[in-house]
């Protein structure tokens, strides 16, 4: 598919509006359903949601000519991308505390997130701004897709965190199964299935990065992250109900 084809703008608009609709639903969850509006999980969820909004709206306005200032576009897009991806990883990290009590592993996961934040973003942001501000932007324009591809690959961390969650949830439910029987088994199957779906979505983001037109795949990323956050809310409630 070529970005210049007739179908590309239609596809971009469709996935963007799905992402923005999901942002509305996520804000309903944030402001009307969350009982505790504090802590790492809440604020990570909040910033990830608004990161999706800024990421999606920046590319939507740029591609349809509403936003014409390249610096403003890159700034909004960068803010959205950093908030969307890093905050989502922190959402995953914060819920690990419900079933994982090994501080060494938790510290390692947090260190990976922080390290990838600097490795994955700083160089890409510099290249992005140089590509639009440099007197001779050619080398930076050529380098940017390479940096962005490496950056996305670094976020295999989300797959790792989801894998840890599946493993330690399984171990926790094994201890509860003798006490709660079928209820614990059903909840375990649900959690494993949903987390596998999240991993599939993470893999889809990586595949999109390497195989789809830039404009369309950036829009799809926003939609995918909005779906993952909606799934995330359903994941959170199961272990909470089990340990009550």
Where are these regions (language model features)?
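Membrane-proximal first intracellular loop
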Residues: 1-117
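Extracellular loop 3-seventh transmembrane helix
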Residues: 9-19, 71-85, 124, 144-161, ...
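Alpha-helical transmembrane segments of polytopic integral membrane proteins
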Residues: 24-27, 89-93, 162-166, 232, ...
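Interhelical loop segments of eukaryotic multi-pass membrane proteins
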Residues: 36-44, 134-139, 178
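Intracellular signaling interfaces of 7-transmembrane GPCRs
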Residues: 37-38, 100-106, 165-188, 236-244
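Helix-to-loop junction signature of class
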Residues: 52-66, 119-135, 163-173, 197-216
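A cytosolic-side transmembrane-helix exit/cap motif
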Residues: 92-98, 128-133, 234-244
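Membrane-proximal helix-loop-helix units in multi-pass membrane proteins
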Residues: 96, 100, 105-167
């Amino acid at each position: 598919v070529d970005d210049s084809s007739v179908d590309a703008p239609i596809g971009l608009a469709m996935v963007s509006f799905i992402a923005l609709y999901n942002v509305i639903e996520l804000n309903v969850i944030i402001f009307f359903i969350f009982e505790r509006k504090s802590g790492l999980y809440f604020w990570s969820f909040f910033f990830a949601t608004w990161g999706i909004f800024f990421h999606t709206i920046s590319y939507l306005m740029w591609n349809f000519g509403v936003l014409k200032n390249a610096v403003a576009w890159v700034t909004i897009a960068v803010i959205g991308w950093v908030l969307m991806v890093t905050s989502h990883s922190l959402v995953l990290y914060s819920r690990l505390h419900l079933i994982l009590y090994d501080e060494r592993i938790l510290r390692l996961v947090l260190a990976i997130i922080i390290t990838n934040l600097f490795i994955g973003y700083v160089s890409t942001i510099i290249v992005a701004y140089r590509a639009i501000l440099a007197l001779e932007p050619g080398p930076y324009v050529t380098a940017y897709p390479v940096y962005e591809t490496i950056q996305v690959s670094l976020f295999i961390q989300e797959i790792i965190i989801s894998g840890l969650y599946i493993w330690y949830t399984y171990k926790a439910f094994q201890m509860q199964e003798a006490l709660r029987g079928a209820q614990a088994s059903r909840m375990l199957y649900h959690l494993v299935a949903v987390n596998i779906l999240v991993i599939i979505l993470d893999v889809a983001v990586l595949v999109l990065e390497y195989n789809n037109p830039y404009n369309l795949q950036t829009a799809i990323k926003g939609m995918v992250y909005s779906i993952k956050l909606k799934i995330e809310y359903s994941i959170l409630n199961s272990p909470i109900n089990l340990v009550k």
